Each structure stands twice: as C-alpha cells, then as structure tokens.
C-alpha cells in the first residue's frame, strides 16, 4: 500500500475549510477517486456528482494549469508533481491546501493485488514475495536517502525530484504488510 503524497492545490490565498470547500465549485479531480466523492457523501450528499463540478484532465499538468488560469478552484496533483508544486508554492503562485490522505485517512493510491486463484495455488511463492517485500521495506526505512538516489537513477530523474515526495514523512507512506488496512 502506498499513500502517495498527492497534494490538493489552489491559487495562493484560496480559502480551505476541508472537503466542504468543493461543494458548488469546479475542481480538477477525477470523480472516480473515492477519497473525494466518498468524503463528499460523508458530508450527507447522496450524489456527489451533482454538488461538485468535477473536471477530468488528461494530465496533472493540465489540472495545475486550470488552477492557475482560474478554470477550476482546486486540483489534485500526482505524486510525481511534488517537485514542481513545491517550486510554485515557494514562489507564492499556489498553495497546498490538503493532501488526498488527509481527505480520507489511509486511502491508498496504489495497492498490490493478486488473483485469488493464483494466490491460493501458489502459497509458498506468495509467502516468499511477502518476505522479500518486508525485507525491502525494512531496508528502505533505514536507508531513505540512498533509496531516493536509487529510485531517481532508475527513473532518470534528479535526487531532488524524488526527494520531494519520498522524503515527505507526513504524506508519503509505503507499507507492504498485507494485513495493514487490507481490502478484502
């Protein structure tokens, strides 16, 4: 499971009262993201599609541009956008008003899954995979700075780009334990 450090951004100075700030607004968030539509439903709205103008863009960059040009009030950014978002925050152009994981606690942007039949037919392989993942996570937690460099090299980016999300200990969490917040 990964809580992927996905910020919600707005123009600098925009009021934020929580998810209720979405009501009646245009937002660059795909309504299929239950962290948001579910949170709107938790406010008592039966159909979140009727009370928020959800705009879907082909990229997070386009969603960010929509905030900057006033087309939408709020936009969800992807994990990979943290470096650029932080630069815009530092310049005073935008601000981070929340994170997806603050809208719905423990909402995971990424989970590993396996088909039930394969899992049931391969118990030793599944156990070996879980052991390897737990060992890898243990190493990652003890060596985050080195992990940043390794990941940056793997994806062809600078360390600062990867550190912008991987070193955010408040919003970026990796947990490979299959029993933690499991989905059955």
Where are these regions (language model features)?
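Ligand-binding "clamshell"
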Residues: 1, 48, 84-100
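Solvent-exposed, acidic/flexible segments
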Residues: 2, 29-33, 56, 60, ...
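A bilobed periplasmic-binding-protein/Venus flytrap-type ligand-binding module shared by bacterial periplasmic
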Residues: 6-16, 108-124
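Bilobed "Venus flytrap"/periplasmic-binding protein-like clamshell domains
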Residues: 7-87, 105-106
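Glycine-rich beta-alpha junction loops
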Residues: 80-81, 103, 155, 170
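A structural motif
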Residues: 100-108
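Secondary-structure end/capping motifs
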Residues: 121-184
